[in-house]
Amino acid sequence: MRQLAHFKFFDTLSKKMVAGFIILILIGTVLLSLPWATPANVHTSLIDVLFTSASATCITGLTVVNTAAHWTTFGQLVILVLSEVGALGYMTFAVLLFNIMRRQIGLSTQLMVKASLNLERLSDTKSVMKYVVGLSLLFQLGGLGLLAIDFVPRFGWRHGLYVSLYHAVMSFCNAGFDVFGDSLQGFRNDPYVLTVTMILIIAGGLGFLVWRDVLLYHTRKRLTLNSKLTLLTTFSLFVIGFVLLLITERDLELLPTGMPWVNRTINTLFLSVTPRTAGLITMPTQGLQAGSLLVIMILMFVGGTPGSTAGGIKTTTFGVLMFQSIAQLRGRRDVEFSHRRFSQENINRALMLIFLASIVLTVATLILTQTEKIPKGFGLEYVLFEVLSAFGTVGLSLGLTPNLTLIGKIVIMMLMFIGRVGIFTSLYALSRRQARVNLIRYPAENILIG
C-alpha cells in the first residue's frame, strides 16, 4: 500500500480521496457478490451489485432491488457498514484504527482527514476526530434506544433491535436504505417514529463541525460564521419547504382519510426534511403534486452542510449566493453577514460550484432522456427528479432507478459518486497538472450583462 503513494495517480489529496472511495465501492461489490449475501437461487447481476455498493458507499439509497427482500441479513449488514464508512469517511475509520493500534498518524493521513472533513487547520484534526466519532455514536446509539421503544414491542426483541439499529444508522447517515420494504409508509400514523427519524436526519445533515461549534458555545460564547450561516440556511429551508409543501399538498390525498391533523402535519414536515439527502418517505412520491415535486427537487439540489453526511451543493453555497444577490440588489460592494464579510474567493467558488453542478445535471438529464423510457403521465421531471436525487445523495425516486438501462445505471452511479465526493474533488482528481500562478494580469473591461 505504501508503494501506491508513489504512483502518479496518487500524487494529490484529491486523487487519494477519490481512489479511496472507489476501492471501498469495489470491496462492497465483492462482499455483496458472495453467495450468502442473497437468498439461495437469487441471482444479482454484477452491475446491480456494483450499483448497490456505490449507492451505499455514497450514502444515497437509490436501489435497483428491494433491500428487504433481495438481500440476506449479511447483505443488509454489508450495506449498513458501507453506509457508515461512506458517511463518516473512510479516513475517519483509518485514523480510529491507528489510534486503537497505538500507531502514529502520519502527516499525509492528517492532511486527508483535514480535506475530507473540510477543516481549516491541520491542528484541529485530532480534536475534531473525537467529536466525529463521539457524536456519531451518541446520536446513533441514542436513536437505537429511542426507536427500540417502538420497534421491540412491535417486532420482538431480536428483530426489533435489528430494525432499530438499521434505521437509526441509515437515518443519521442520511443513506435512505430500509429493511421494511416500503420505506416508512407503514409508519405514517406513528408520529413518534417519524419525529425520532427527523431528529436523526437533521443531526446527520447538519455537519460535525457545526455540532462541535454548538457544543463548545458555552465556553467560547460565540459561533463561527460558517455555523451561523449553516444554521440560518438550514432552518430557513426547513420552514420554507414545510410551508410550500403545506400549500402544494394541502389536500394530502396520498394519506388515509380521517388521519388526525397532527399526523398529517408531521407527515408534511417529514416530507420537507427527507429531501435534505435522507431518502426515507412516508407516502408514494409518484402521487405527489407537480408543485411538491418542484419543491423537493430544489431541496435535493441544495442538500446539506459541508463536512456532514449530506450531498448537494450544500447549504453554505446556497447561503453565500443568497446574500451575494441581496448585496447586489442593495448596491453594496461587500457581501456581509453577521458583521462579517464573505471573501471574494468564497463567492467565486460558490458561483463556480453552481455552474459546474448545472452542467453536470444538464448533461446527465439529457443522456437519460435518450436512454430511458418515460412512462405515460410523466414528463421531464421523471428523469430530472432521479438525477437530482443521485447528485444530492438523497435516495428518493419516482420509479426510474429499478428500471434503468445499463447506461442509465452508469450515469446515476457517476452522479452519486460526484455528489458524495464533491465536484471540486472529482475535477481536481482528473486534472493532470497543478494550478499555476498567472504572472500576467490584463486590463479589466465591462460587458453587458442581463
Listing of model-derived features with the role each one plays in the protein:
Residues 1-450:
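Membrane-proximal intracellular helices of multi-pass ion channels
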